[in-house]
Amino acid sequence: MAHVGSRKRSRSRSRSRSGRRGSEKRSKRSSKDASRNCSASRSQGHKAGSASGVEERSKHKAQRTSRSSSTSSSSSSSSSASSSSSSDGRKKRAKHKEKKRKKKKKKRKKKLKKRVKEKAVAVHQAEALPGPSLDQWHRSAGEDNDGPVLTDEQKSRIQAMKPMTKEEWDARQSVIRKVVDPETGRTRLIKGDGEVLEEIVTKERHREINKQATRGDGLAFQMRTGLLP
């Protein structure tokens, strides 16, 4: 009987131990399942969070690209508008300058035409009013006996005022005359109205001319300074 009781006790103990082991195994399994479920839920949450972050990032990128495109389009439109306005301003300035230049040209042409007309009128008036001739002087002298009598010098001046032909001019310019300088005493050859000619002389004649010239220079100096009585 004692042996049977010991067997029963050992069986009950083994059963209780096996029950405990089973319960421990079950608890371990349940804890493992719970940990697995937690890790799975965590991984799912992490995946969901990462997916939402990716979506938000993609949204931000799209917004940035749209903003950059809008800013670039606005800047390009503003630059094109500024360039068009600057080109319009340049064209207006060029047109204004061209108008000013044309006005100045017209004014210059008018002034030139006016001057030419004035000169032509003056020349025509001078031609229409000729100066007094020698015949007119003679007529006036014959008509008015009480008037002044013309001298030879006045007659020569009046004659010089008359137009001469080419033959008369050549004959006048071909006349050679000797003129004595009162200050130096030198005798010069003058052709026509004032062309001075050189006279070819010998050495002795040249010395005499120089002596006369120096003597005349001295006398002229003494007369100017008052040294001569």
From Swiss-Prot:
Region annotated Disordered, chain positions: 1-152
Positions carrying Phosphoserine: 140, 174
Ranges of compositional bias, category Basic residues: 1-20, 90-117
Glycyl lysine isopeptide (Lys-Gly) (interchain with G-Cter in SUMO2) cross-link, renumbered residues: 191
Keywords annotated in UniProt: Isopeptide bond, mRNA processing, mRNA splicing, Nucleus, Phosphoprotein, Ubl conjugation
Biased composition (Basic and acidic residues): 21-35
Expression sites by tissue: Widely expressed. Expressed at high level in testis and thymus.
Superkingdom classification of source: Eukaryota
One GO BP: RNA splicing
Cellular component GO terms, alphabetical: nuclear speck; nucleolus
Signal peptide region: none
Ranges of Low complexity composition bias in the record: 66-87
Localization (cell): Nucleus, Nucleolus; Nucleus speckle
Major localization listed first in the record, in broad terms: nucleus
Family designation: Belongs to the ARL6IP4 family.
Function: Involved in modulating alternative pre-mRNA splicing with either 5' distal site activation or preferential use of 3' proximal site.
Subunit and interaction comment: Interacts with ZCCHC17. Interacts with SRSF2. Interacts with ARL6.
Protein name, UniProt field: ADP-ribosylation factor-like protein 6-interacting protein 4
Organism, scientific name: Mus musculus
Source taxonomy: Eukaryota, Metazoa, Chordata, Craniata, Vertebrata
